[in-house]
Amino acid sequence: SRGNSMTNAHGVHILADYTGFFPKLDNTGEWILSLMEKVVDESTANRVHSHIEEFDGTSSPPGFAAVVLLDESHLTAHCYSEKGWLSIDCFTCGSTNPGAIIDAMHSAIQEASPGIKLEKRKTEARFTNG
C-alpha cells in the first residue's frame, strides 16, 4: 500500500531495540550522548540541541534518556541499565539518511558492549500524506 512505500514518504523513522547492553564504561549515558552528537555531526543532519537525563533508580529504574534534536527531526536513546536494554531511534525528513546514523551508532555500541544483541530493527515511512 502507499502508506508503506518509502518513495512516497517525506520522512523515515528507524527504531532499534537491543538487549545485553552492559558496556564497561564509567558514564554510559554521557558516552552515548557524545556518540550520538559525533554520529550526527558526521552525517548530513543538522544538530540543534542535545540533552541527557540520567536516572539513578530513585523514582524510576536506573538508566538514561538522551536526545539530539535535529533540524530534520531527532535521534534518541533510552536505556534500562540494570536490564541491559537499549533502544535507539532516528527520524529524519528530507535527504538525510537515518539508516546511516543508526548503522554508525550500531557499530560503536557493538564495539563498546560485545555481548549486545539487536532484537529488532524497523523502518517506518513517515509523512506519507502526499
Model regions and ranges:
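Polybasic/polar functional segments that serve as interface/processing modules
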Residues: R2-G130
